[in-house]
A protein has these predicted regions:
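Short intrinsically disordered terminal tails
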Residues: 1-4, 63-64
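Intrinsically disordered, low-complexity sequence elements enriched in Ser/Thr/Gly/Pro
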Residues: 1, 19, 23, 57-59
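Intrinsically disordered, low-complexity, charged/polar segments
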Residues: 44-64
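Short coil-to-beta transition motif at edge beta-strands of beta-rich domains
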Residues: 3-16
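Basic/aromatic-rich interaction segments and small domains that mediate binding to polyanionic partners
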Residues: 13-51
Length: 64
């Protein structure tokens, strides 16, 4: 896994958020900044609703 690129379909772990899987790339409609769409992976592998986070924030949180 690259240290400066968020890959799609990959699992990432954070102590506060937990296990997530990236599902899409998107853009903020106001600023046109890149965003990452992801789902939280719960007990038994069940996915949550989709969340979005700015790509730079996602990198800081999940890619150390």
């Amino acid at each position: 896994m690259s240290k400066n690129y968020v890959e799609m379909g990959v699992y990432y772990m954070d102590k506060t958020i937990g296990l997530v899987r990236t599902v899409s790339r998107m853009s903020d409609y106001k600023t046109n900044d890149p965003m990452i769409g992801f789902v939280k992976v719960g007990e038994g592998g069940v996915a949550s609703e989709m969340y979005a986070m700015p790509e730079n924030v996602f990198k800081e949180k999940f890619i150390h």
